[in-house]
Regions:
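Bacterial N-terminal signal peptides that target proteins for export
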Residues: 1-8
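C-terminal motif of bacterial Sec signal peptides marking the signal peptidase cleavage site
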Residues: 15-18
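N-terminal low-complexity, Pro/Thr/Ser-rich intrinsically disordered segments
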Residues: 26-40
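Pocket-flanking alpha-helical
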Residues: 59, 73-114, 131, 139, ...
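A structural signal for short loop-to-beta-strand junctions that line the ligand-binding cleft
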Residues: 113-124
Length: 240
């Protein structure tokens, strides 16, 4: 992440030089090609919005950052939790991360072994938390999740950092359900073959997993209790 901050500052400086350098001979500058800078962008598994956003962002950076020698590659990862650790180790130059997971990582709480030093470059889009179930499953409220097999995201991706508060606000814990780990597209398959009664498919809108699920069957969007929503907003900054 520090490397990206440097590159952004360098880009701004180069623009100022280009605009304010009148009187000099521009031929030398036009003939010298910039050094190639290879950048890696951590996204998430295919099937979610992070992978789509990340791939588009990498293409945009290559298109408009070519003058600075940028060559950006979007990497499929397990998601925010892996991205944060790989940023810290230097394996990634920058990455996408969910606000809830980042919130705990920078504080070194809720299972994070240390406080991770990161810099936010920009906000992409609101991350919408959605629970869906087949229309004929009988799961229509959050309370109906008790005793059910429920898709809770990829193992190790950090979904639990916001799923646990969402469930907890409704008086539900992981002990009350049978949690199933899968990518978002994999979670939709679990619904389709009856392996899960409901799944979590958080992300920005439009979410490819929602499109995939609704194309093959009728689905319910499970609503949040209004009191639980207010409790989450009051307790956690990332739900505001």
């Amino acid at each position: 992440m520090r490397r990206v901050g440097f590159l952004v500052a360098l880009m701004v400086s180069a623009l100022f030089v280009a605009c304010g350098g009148g009187g000099g001979d521009g031929d030398d500058a036009s003939e010298s090609a910039p050094s190639r800078v290879f950048l890696s962008l951590g996204t998430a598994p295919p099937g979610g919005t992070f992978f789509v956003f990340g791939s588009a962002l990498a293409e945009t950076m290559n298109e408009f950052g070519g003058g600075f020698g940028w060559n950006t590659t979007a990497e499929a990862t397990s998601g925010s939790q892996e991205n944060i650790r790989r940023l810290d180790s230097g394996e990634l130059d920058f990455a996408l991360s969910n606000a809830a997971i980042t919130y705990f990582a920078v504080r070194g709480t809720e299972g994070w072994e240390k406080a991770y030093q990161m810099r936010t470059v920009m906000t992409l889009a609101p991350n919408v938390a959605l629970w869906i179930s087949p229309a004929d499953s009988g799961v229509e409220t959050m309370a109906d999740l008790r005793g059910q097999r429920v898709g809770v995201g990829v193992a190790g991706a950090g979904f639990e950092y916001f799923i646990r508060p969402l469930l907890g606000a409704h008086g539900i814990t992981y002990d009350d359900i049978t949690p199933l780990n899968a990518t978002q597209s994999g979670a939709v398959d679990l619904l389709a073959d009856g392996s899960a009664a409901a799944v979590f498919v958080g992300g920005a809108i439009p979410n490819p997993a929602i499109t995939q699920a609704s194309a093959s069957q009728e689905i319910n969007f499970i609503p949040f209790d209004e009191t639980a929503k207010q409790q989450l907003i009051d307790e956690y900054l990332f739900f505001r």
